[in-house]
């Protein structure tokens, strides 16, 4: 479809969303609605792609250009200065095309997120096969409220579209509706647009009126009925956004299941459209896989896990974990209750256990951080073990510094690494050690001094407390026990003769 142009209408105010964010930039399944529309039409390979913006153009136009860059194609921006209706918006879009363009013009909207390339391709194929001047998508809805109704002759020919506000009672009973997706011959479109009028309930230039004008000129009008209404459903408010988001998620989840992924509870599992998952992976309830997350094969993910832009290697287990912009190596085990902040890279067969938080940290193959530890701005080698309750002290209030831990290192519980500091390969640290200076390879670092017990401190400093009473009772019990032990071990007195 190289000799074609696509015009995406994204100029509406979207007032029913009641949001400072433009309607077409609201997201579902990891993409804005505009991005969904642009991905669908980009699959057709059109020569020109025009996005018409109006209100909120300062947000919508840059977003459209960024999406185009991601898709690797040029996007032209057309501005609708005044909101004068869909017909006027398309006219603004045509102005962005070269004057000598003579191909097919596909018109769609930026708020139809489930519309796919296959449906658009079917529209184009029918348009070409029938040598039509205009071809439109229609669907049938149980509740057609808000949609334009399709008007047909007794023999089924499409003769026009009537908008809800202008429809009679009998016309409002029609359940076949306009999907607002069209393929026009550019000549027929230009001619019809030049004759649109505002004599309607909204006082606007309706693109839908172009259908009757083309037919009145003797042009060929064809329709493609879409049996799945969700594919062409639009979004006007947050209720519809949530409904379509749930429907899209259901389809995404089902596609992964058919590809060999076990999803235990689809109702509580949310997967963005750009996520990839390998075969024989099990996704447990309450899991969200978001953004560009890529999960390998034979993994176990969840329950109650959220991963955003995280790469998970084959055979890894990730349990009750929240992770963002991180990497988890093959065979690694993460969780439960682990927090992976951006920049975390866990090597193959590594472990990050309960209540471990990591940030901007590289953790080598086979290294374990089992529990209750913060690892920030650190590089840890292979097959090391970080004891419980250790803290990588990376921030002095002004500057963040890195800690480097070698391979085959064993650190005792409650070790503090005050960055910048380096611990050499094979070194050990004692429990409760504060590492302020580098530790040579193979050394044992101990910073705690000898333990000192201050006898009677509680009785003197906390008299009358429960602690003092318990200590006094223990002391008394100890004296009694000592006396009993002394009696048991005492030698009997020597016998005397009489």
UniProtKB/Swiss-Prot annotation:
Residues 470-498 are annotated as: Disordered. Residues 260-498 are annotated as: N-acetyltransferase. UDP-N-acetyl-alpha-D-glucosamine binds at residues 9-12, 23, 80, 85-86, 148, 163, 178, 236, 341, 359, 374, 385. It is found in: Cytoplasm. Residues 1-238 are annotated as: Pyrophosphorylase. Pathway: Nucleotide-sugar biosynthesis; UDP-N-acetyl-alpha-D-glucosamine biosynthesis; N-acetyl-alpha-D-glucosamine 1-phosphate from alpha-D-glucosamine 6-phosphate (route II): step 2/2; Nucleotide-sugar biosynthesis; UDP-N-acetyl-alpha-D-glucosamine biosynthesis; UDP-N-acetyl-alpha-D-glucosamine from N-acetyl-alpha-D-glucosamine 1-phosphate: step 1/1; Bacterial outer membrane biogenesis; LPS lipid A biosynthesis. It catalyses: alpha-D-glucosamine 1-phosphate + acetyl-CoA = N-acetyl-alpha-D-glucosamine 1-phosphate + CoA + H(+); N-acetyl-alpha-D-glucosamine 1-phosphate + UTP + H(+) = UDP-N-acetyl-alpha-D-glucosamine + diphosphate. Keywords: Acyltransferase, Cell shape, Cell wall biogenesis/degradation, Cytoplasm, Magnesium, Metal-binding, Multifunctional enzyme, Nucleotidyltransferase, Peptidoglycan synthesis, Repeat, Transferase. One of its GO terms (molecular function) is magnesium ion binding. Residues 239-259 are annotated as: Linker. It comes from the Bacteria. GO terms for cellular component: cytoplasm; membrane. InterPro entries: Bifunctional_GlmU, GlmU-like, GlmU_C_LbH, Hexapep, NTP_transferase_dom, Nucleotide-diphossugar_trans, Trimer_LpxA-like_sf. One of its GO terms (biological process) is cell wall organization. Acetyl-CoA binds at residues 388, 394-395, 413, 431. It is an enzyme of class 2 (transferase). Pfam families: Hexapep, NTP_transferase. The keyword Plastid does not apply. Its main location: cytoplasm. Its cofactor is Mg(2+). The active site is at residue 371. Homotrimer. Catalyzes the last two sequential reactions in the de novo biosynthetic pathway for UDP-N-acetylglucosamine (UDP-GlcNAc). The C-terminal domain catalyzes the transfer of acetyl group from acetyl coenzyme A to glucosamine-1-phosphate (GlcN-1-P) to produce N-acetylglucosamine-1-phosphate (GlcNAc-1-P), which is converted into UDP-GlcNAc by the transfer of uridine 5-monophosphate (from uridine 5-triphosphate), a reaction catalyzed by the N-terminal domain. In the N-terminal section; belongs to the N-acetylglucosamine-1-phosphate uridyltransferase family. This is Bifunctional protein GlmU. It comes from Mycolicibacterium gilvum (strain PYR-GCK) (Mycobacterium gilvum (strain PYR-GCK)).
